[in-house]
Amino acid sequence: MFIKYLLIIVFSLPSISLTIIDVRTEAEWKSGYLDGAIHIEWQDILQLSSKISKDEEIYLYCKSGNRSGKATKILTDAGYLNAKNAGSIKQAGKLLNKEIINN
């Protein structure tokens, strides 16, 4: 009985919009990326302003977490308060439960 009510609660929750962004170079992206991620190099991150709501949950990753940290700062300074640095591609994969897609 408890499980039935738990499922009702879970399925009644509003869906959360989530965007995963790979901020590495084009060559790094082509070597593999997280399933469901979009690619935009960190220095071009503000191009998102017309495409993604400032309320959306955004996770950014790169090779080590450095560039994604810079991109996260740019976004938070621009009002994207739900932007989060997910670290390296491996860390982000674990955090978000996403596989790396290799081309």
What are these regions (language model features)?
Residues 1-8:
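Sec-dependent signal peptide recognition
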Residues 2, 18-19, 25-57, 66-103:
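Rhodanese-like catalytic fold shared by cysteine-dependent sulfurtransferases
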Residues 12-15:
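N-terminal signal peptide c-region/cleavage motif recognized by signal peptidases
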Residues 61:
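Short, surface-exposed ligand- or partner-binding patches at beta-edge/loop junctions that are enriched
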